[in-house]
């Protein structure tokens, strides 16, 4: 089996905001991401309840750029199960009720690929989509998955969706025992457009905690689901299983936010059904789709 490894290019960490060319993250990039996930200085705690905590970057509260960090303690979920759930694109379609469409496009290396993801936003905002370069790396008993936006010539922005930009988004999964772990989600995203304050507040106070809890429920049900759906197919662990075509990095370019259309939704008010249900998108907490 080919061993997934980070790029060994002899260069320093590339700041997410200053990235000018498409490159597969190296070991230093993974270490930098881990350090930011574990950092406390400069973050404001906005939510802490039932093992889930949410922070926002203090200096970004009133700007277009949104930076959020969520952490959840997962009892009865091994780190490797959570890692599988985040990778398994077919299972994500079952548990992620906000997803509109998601698919892998091409393989770059044994631990990097390019993919598409579109999702429902709280009504009446326009829905978003993104093309990202995703990379992953096991680090002992821990795991990191992270991504940033790229441009692919065959997948330009669509008229019915707003193309968002992931400056850097990812997960740090830390094992705390044979059947427990802690996951930290860190996102630095430009959703493209001037969003109303209620969206920013709702994301940190409700949508992010709800998404983490839904992920936890999905992890509990994953082993049973996977036994019925290609139990041995895990290309993120066994790259030789990947059916994806190979793609050269030269085919991609960095997706800069300033090159995309800016949508002003700052005056949009929350819909009546969103206020009543408190939902992000149209999904519910019904877990019947996970069977």
Curated annotation (Swiss-Prot):
CDD domains per UniProt: START_STARD10-like
Tissue: Testis, kidney, liver, and intestine with the highest level in the testis.
Methyltransferase as UniProt keyword: no
Matching SUPFAM superfamilies: Bet v1-like (SSF55961)
A Gene Ontology cellular-component term: membrane
GO molecular function annotation: lipid binding
Residues annotated with N-acetylmethionine modification: 1
A biological-process GO annotation: lipid transport
Annotated compartments: Cell projection, Cilium, Flagellum; Cytoplasm; Membrane
UniProt KW keywords: Acetylation, Cell projection, Cilium, Cytoplasm, Flagellum, Lipid transport, Lipid-binding, Membrane, Phosphoprotein, Transport
Protein name per its UniProtKB record: START domain-containing protein 10
Upper lineage: Eukaryota, Metazoa, Chordata, Craniata, Vertebrata
């Amino acid at each position: 089996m080919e061993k997934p490894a980070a790029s060994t290019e002899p260069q320093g960490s590339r700041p997410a905001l200053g990235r000018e060319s498409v490159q597969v993250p190296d070991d230093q990039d993974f270490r930098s991401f881990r350090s930011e996930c574990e950092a406390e200085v400069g973050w404001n705690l906005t939510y802490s309840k039932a093992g889930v905590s949410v922070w926002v970057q203090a200096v970004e509260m009133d700007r277009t750029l949104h930076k959020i960090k969520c952490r959840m303690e997962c009892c009865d979920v091994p780190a490797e199960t959570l890692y599988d759930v985040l990778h398994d694109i077919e299972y994500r379609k079952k548990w992620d009720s906000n997803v509109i469409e998601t698919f892998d496009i091409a393989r770059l290396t044994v631990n990097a690929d390019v993919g598409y993801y579109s999702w429902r936003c709280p009504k009446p905002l326009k829905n978003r989509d993104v093309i990202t370069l995703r990379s992953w790396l096991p680090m002992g008993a821990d795991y990191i998955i992270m991504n940033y936006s790229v441009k692919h010539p065959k997948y330009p922005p669509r008229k019915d969706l707003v193309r968002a930009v992931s400056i850097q988004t990812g997960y740090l999964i830390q094992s705390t025992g044979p059947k427990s772990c802690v996951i930290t989600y860190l996102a630095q995203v430009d959703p493209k457009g001037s969003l109303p304050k209620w969206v920013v507040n709702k994301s940190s106070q409700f949508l992010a905690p709800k998404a983490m809890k839904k992920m936890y429920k999905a992890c509990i049900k994953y082993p049973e689901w996977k036994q019925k759906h290609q139990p041995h197919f895990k290309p993120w662990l066994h790259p030789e299983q990947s059916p994806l075509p190979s793609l050269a990095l030269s085919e991609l370019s960095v997706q800069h936010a300033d090159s995309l259309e800016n949508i002003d939704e700052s005056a949009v008010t929350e819909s009546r059904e969103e206020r009543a249900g408190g939902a992000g998108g149209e999904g519910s907490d019904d877990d019947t789709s996970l069977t």
